[in-house]
Amino acid sequence: MSENYSFSLRKFKLVFLGEQSVGKTSLITRFMYDQFDNTYQATIGIDFLSKTMYLEDRTVRLQLWDTAGQERFRSLIPSYIRDSSVAIIVYDITNHNSFVNTEKWIEDVRAERGDDVIIVLVGNKTDLADKRQVTQEEGEKKAKELKIMHMETSAKAGHNVKLLFRKIAQMLPGMENVETQSTQMIDVSIQPNENESSCNC
């Protein structure tokens, strides 16, 4: 039993990128602890957390690297992108400039990793829909053009956060067979929970 567990437990590095105050840390905190802190504190440099995810017949360990959005820390980021499995590019749907700037973050990822990385574009803060500056269609269009995954979330309300990480886990290298075998079961178990969310965004 322990042998099978050791074999199936693979580690994957997920790097969170994006401008300052788009909610990178809040997404990680919601996923890790199911909590949201209203007090904003800028990430200084790089933070690291790890969480084990239990899927249908596979267990994976996700290493979550939270990067600072400030310009003065930009020189640190390429070294963290270099050996990542997933790059999660976050923007704030109430800040159009943060959406525009996702292009340079994606360019940085491509420069370091080429096509050997999963890139996910995430529009955060859907709980502030009345202040929205970026439509969901704009996000989906950009993701389609770049052939990457797109999802909107609210770290504050918890909307789509678990689903985001579940979908990322399904896309990880070596997970193709698991996804093929259990797609229907996953859809049935996840979607109703998300639809029942109290968030109207």
From Swiss-Prot:
In which residues is GTP bound? 18-25, 66-70, 124-127
- Indicate where this protein is primarily found: membrane
Lipid anchor positions (S-geranylgeranyl cysteine): 199, 201
Q: Where is this motif: Effector region?
A: 40-48
GO CC, alphabetical? cytosol; endomembrane system; endosome membrane; Golgi apparatus; Golgi membrane; nucleus
Which Pfam families does the UniProt entry name for this protein?
Ras
Instruction: Provide the positions where the record notes the PTM Cysteine methyl ester.
Output: 201
Q: What is the effect of changing residue 25 to N?
A: Growth inhibited in ypt3-i5 mutant cells; no effect on wild-type cells
Where in or outside the cell? Endosome membrane; Golgi apparatus membrane; Nucleus; Cytoplasm, Cytosol
Kindly give the membrane topology term recorded for this protein: Lipid-anchor
Signal peptide (from-to): none
UniProtKB keywords: Cytoplasm, Endosome, Golgi apparatus, GTP-binding, Lipoprotein, Membrane, Methylation, Nucleotide-binding, Nucleus, Prenylation, Protein transport, Transport
Q: Give the Gene Ontology MF terms in alphabetical order.
A: GTP binding; GTPase activity; protein kinase regulator activity
Family membership, please give it: Belongs to the small GTPase superfamily. Rab family.
The UniProt function text for this chain reads: Has a role in retrograde traffricking of proteins from the endosome to the Golgi. Involved in protein transport to the plasma membrane. Involved in the secretory pathway where it has a role in acid phosphatase secretion. Required also in normal glycosylation trafficking pathways.
Protein name in UniProt? GTP-binding protein ryh1
